Design a protein with these regions (language model features):
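Short acidic capping loops at alpha-helix termini that bridge into adjacent secondary structure
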Residues: 2, 108-112, 138-139
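Acyl-CoA/ACP chain-elongation machinery
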Residues: 5-41, 45, 74-88, 117-125, ...
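Condensing-enzyme catalytic core mediating Claisen C-C bond formation in acyl metabolism
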Residues: 32-107, 111-112
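Short, conserved catalytic or adaptor-binding loops enriched in Gly and charged residues
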Residues: 62-63, 133-136
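Alpha-helix capping/termination and helix-coil
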Residues: 98, 102-106, 114-117, 121, ...
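Charged helix-capping and loop-helix junction motifs
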Residues: 127-131
Length: 191
C-alpha cells in the first residue's frame, strides 16, 4: 500500500523574523480588527502578518471509502526572479502552475480558489492578475485564510488544504469578512 504523511509547520514569530519583514516594509502596522488585509486591493500599505501553524495529511493512492478529498491534478512552475522576494507583476509562474494543474485534471470547472495572497500590495496584485489571466470571465470564487492567522510560511499550503477540505465537506464557502463577495456562491462546491 502506498501512503505518505505530508504536511507543513512553521513558527516564525521570532524577533529576528519580525525584524526582517519590517525591514522589507511588508509587515502590517494597521490598528484594525483584521490587520492582514489579504486580497484587499484598496489597501495603501503592505499588511502582512506572521502566524504560527501546522497541518498534516495522509495521502493514499487510489479511491478510498473514507477519503476526505481527491487530488485530481497538479501543477508547478518557476520563474526568473530579480530579487529573493520578487514576483513578476502578472504572476507568470502562478499562471503556468494553475494552467498545468487544470490541464492535468482534465480542465474541470473550478468553484473556489484559495489564494496564497499574503497581504502585500505587489504580491496580492500579481496573484490576482495571474488568476484573471487564467480564468478570465470564468473566475471562480476567491478566498484566503491569512486574515485569521497571518502568513505561516511553511504551514500555509497545509492550512489551505485543510480549508479546502472543510469547505468541500460542509459545502460552505468561507468568505473574507472585510471584502464584498461579488460572485454568487454555488449551491454545491465540487472542485
Amino acid at each position: 500500500e502506498e501512503r505518505f504523511l505530508v504536511g507543513g509547520t512553521e513558527a516564525p514569530l521570532t524577533p529576528f523574523t519580525i525584524a526582517q519583514v519590517k525591514a522589507l516594509k511588508i509587515y502590517s502596522s494597521l490598528p484594525l480588527p483584521y490587520p492582514c488585509r489579504s486580497m484587499d486591493m484598496t489597501k495603501k500599505q503592505n499588511t502582512m502578518v506572521l502566524g504560527e501553524g501546522a497541518g498534516c495529511f495522509c495521502l493514499e493512492k487510489g479511491e478510498r471509502p473514507n477519503a476526505l478529498a481527491y487530488i485530481i491534478g497538479i501543477g508547478f512552475a518557476t520563474e526568473q526572479l530579480t530579487h529573493s522576494v520578487s514576483l513578476s507583476p502578472d504572476g507568470q509562474c502562478l499562471q503556468e502552475s494553475m494552467r498545468s494543474a487544470l490541464e492535468s485534471a482534465g480542465n474541470p470547472k473550478i468553484d473556489v480558489v484559495i489564494t496564497h495572497c499574503t497581504g502585500t500590495i505587489k504580491g496580492d496584485r500579481a496573484e490576482l492578475n495571474a488568476i484573471e489571466a487564467v480564468f478570465g470571465a470564468q473566475k471562480p470564487l476567491l478566498t484566503n485564510n491569512k486574515w485569521q492567522h497571518g502568513h505561516t510560511y511553511g504551514a500555509s499550503g497545509a492550512l489551505n488544504l485543510g480549508m479546502a477540505i472543510e469547505m468541500l465537506q460542509s459545502n460552505t464557502f468561507q468568505p473574507i469578512p472585510y471584502l464584498d463577495e461579488a460572485n454568487e456562491v454555488p449551491e454545491k462546491l465540487q472542485t
